[in-house]
Structures are given as structure tokens and as C-alpha cells.
Amino acid sequence: MMFAVATMAATTVCRVRKITDPDMSAVRVADLRTERMTDPMSIDTPVPRLGWRILSAKNDVVQTSYHIIVASTREKALNGEGDLWDCEVGSDQSQWITYGGKELRSDTRCYWRVKINTTQGESDWSDVAMWNVGLLSESDWRGQWIGLDHAMPWEVEDVHSRLGARYLRSEFDTEGEIKRATLYISGLGLYEAYINGQRVGDRVLAPPPTDYRRTVIYDAYDVTGLIAGDNAVAVAVGNGRYYTMQQNKKPYKITNFGYPKLRLNLVIEYADGKKKTVSTDGKWKLSADGAIRSDNEYDGEIYDARKEFDGWTMPGYDDSRWQTAERVAIPYGTLRGNMSPGMTVLKEIEPKSVTPISVSDARQSVVVDLGQNIAGWLKVKIPDVEAGDTVRIRYAEKINDDGSLWRDNLRHAYSTDYYIADGTEQGRWWQPAFTYHGFRYAEISILPADATKEKTPDSHLSTLNSQLYRLCRQRRDGAHGYVRVRRHRAQQDIPQRHVGRAGQLQGHAGRLSAAR
């Protein structure tokens, strides 16, 4: 088995000006950002703020003026046609410059460049950057909130609620040449979206959590390259912090905001200027009886491969046995674009050691030591096991003297992922979709489907040891170290704890304020 452990304003002059291509200067402009993000897709304001970095091999370089152009197409920006905004300012300001051009509407792409003068000479024009204005008004959303406002008979709602993922899908066709396509999506609490079998974007655990009574976040993606003639859009929706895991334990402290739900607009613009919008409505199909049987950040994820929907993200899938999605309760919070970079996988790291260990209920087990505390999960390569066999992954920050996991600090949190085999794995890769863990150590065990059946204890142990590979670690927006791996739009403690008595936010406030 393989486990992948993976700035002041002066006189302002605005006029049309032709871009020239001077020789490369020692001064360069780079790292163009809109609201401190690179090429963001869900800008939630018609007047965003722009900024850039000044690079030079010389000393004493001070900006004296800047020239910004903003265009409606990349070609116009490259040709120097700032049809949305063309502005030259005598100023040393290079951050938080408010857009002052034509009024921007929802679902508008903007392409921009900047050139500066400095005490050490003039820069060349920067590369073209972009931003996309999101859906600024509720009236811009055609999609309804859909899902199920109840649990299924096999699901458990108690101190350790067990609610599985909701799988939703719809098919549509397109006609004519597509100029661009943009997906606007909010899946509460978490989502993974697919178009024609391809995963949309590289974000994980999206969207970031909020106080859903005040704000609900949506993401936007450029999906132009994913759209064909016959199409399917499919979304798996997890619980996240919307449907909470311990709601019946301390309801006065742990707010439950409702059942998982989805809202989506897919805006397709054709080359002739016409638009088509695919949105969530009463025609979508839904199933709650899929492979993800349970998911939350405290307890982990339970995945049963025997319940997989083979091909459900592709057009032509037979969903006749699925039920029709219901129109569900609307969240109280205002729907706003995600004005943060989003969480992605930072890197995959090698474990420091892998040690066999005896665990009473397991056929075989190893303990993985990463050598450092991280926030993330294990990605595992499942060996040739029998249907019903379970790979269990338990997480901890410390170990006992005998090498077993020390998990007393987790209290009521299980912090455990399960993969239940269908018997046809033969080296398939798997990782949880809707949970993550704070840990240094992980105990990986194979649990037999029938505990009384005779097994060969060492049949997979050498494979466990020799093929242990890497670990997925998540990226955090913020400073390095602790801060970087503890951010999910807002600062968080490790996911399995639910108290903040140590003053983590106060202790790291200085580093947060200095983070790029």
C-alpha cells in the first residue's frame, strides 16, 4: 500500500496615450495585484484597489509617477487602448490605488497594465494582469438555493452527527463559438465542482467559513476551456462549518446554520455577444447515498468506495434513480464574492519515519512521523484488499512512550478518516475531500471486513513500509510557519480543537499584520 502523505497622490492627468516598447530598463514593475490578489475572479466591488511591486538592481529607486490602463480585452490592453480607464498620476503611491474609470457591471473582465517613472529612470510596461467583477447584486443571480432540508433515514444527528455529502448534477448543451465561460458557485458548507469530468479549480475546502448569518461566500472560476457541445456540471457538497458536527452538545455555543445546499450560475458568452446562463433550479438531480458517508472537520471523513457513482460528473450519466433537488431555505447572510486567494495544496512532503505498531483491532498498522506539525491530510494508495476492508487513518500531535498515538487533547473529536474498499482498488489513490487535520503523527491501519476471518498479518506490511510516499499539506494565506498553515480566510486553531483559550489570535496579531 502506498500512502501519500500530500504611498501619496499629487496632480492627476488622465488622457489616452500610446504604449511604446522602449529598451528594457533597470526598473521593472511586477506582481500586479487587485485587492492584494493575483488575477482574482470574484471581486466584490465595482471600484477595486490596485497595486504592484517595483523591482530594480539599482539602489535609491523611488517612484515619481505611474500610468495605468484598464481595458475590456487583453488585446486592447496589449495595444495600449485603455477603453475602461487610462490614467497618469504624479505620485509615489504603488498600493491601494482605487480604480477610477468607467462604471463596471457584474460579470465584467478587466485587463490592466502599469508603467512607472522613478528617480532611476522609466520602467517598461508590465505584463497584463486581470480581474473579474463578480455578481454584485442579488438580481444578478438566477440560480436558486437547492439541496435537501432534512437528513436521510440512514444518517445520524446527535453529538457526533453523521451526515453524508450531497451529490448534485445537471446537463446542458451549447451552440456556437464560446468566447468565455465563468462559473459562480457557493456550496455550503464545502464543495467540489466538476464540468465534463474535470475538476474546477485547485482550491480545497472551499468556500472559507464565515458567520453565515451575516456573510456567505461564493467563488468564481474561468471554465472556458471545460465547455464542449454536450455538457454536465456536477457538484459534491459537504458539511463544513455550516452543518455543524456537535450541534446537540452545546447548541448555545455551536451554531447549526442548516443543511448543505448549493447555488450556482454558469455564465457562457458566445463570440457573437449572446449569453447563456446555466443555474441551479428544480430540474437538478440529487443523491445523498454516495461514497462520502460522513464528513466534518472535527471527526474526519468516512468514504465507502462501494457507493461510488461511476461517471456521475460526465454527460450522459443515468441519474434516473436520483431524486429531484429541492428548493431549500435561503441563508441569512449576504452573498459576497471571495476576496481572498483561497486555500490550495501548498506542497507534498516526505515522512521522517514509518514504524510498524501493534493495534488490537487492526490486521496491520504503522505510525507515520512527519517530523513537524502540519495542517493537512494523508493521501493513500490503496493495495489489493477485499471488499469491505477498511483503511483507517488516525491523527495526533504527540505519541506515547510505546509509540502509540497520544490523543487525549482531542477530547470529543475523533480526527479519523476511513476508506472502505470495494475490492477493486489495486493501487488507486484516495484522499478526503471535506476535512483536514492538525497533526505530526498518523496511525494507518487495515481493518478486515470480517474480524474473525483468518488473515496473513504481514501480507501487506512490507508494502506499507516501502511505498509510504508523501503527505498533502494545505496552503494558508498569510505569513510563514504557524500563521501560514492556520488560515482559512480567517485565522484558525487546529481543526480538531474547539476552544481558543491560549490567545492564539492575539499572540500572532503582529505577524498577521506584517504578512504579505
Specify the residue positions occupied by each region the protein language model found.
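Extracellular/oxidizing-compartment recognition motifs
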Residues: 16, 21-109, 113-515
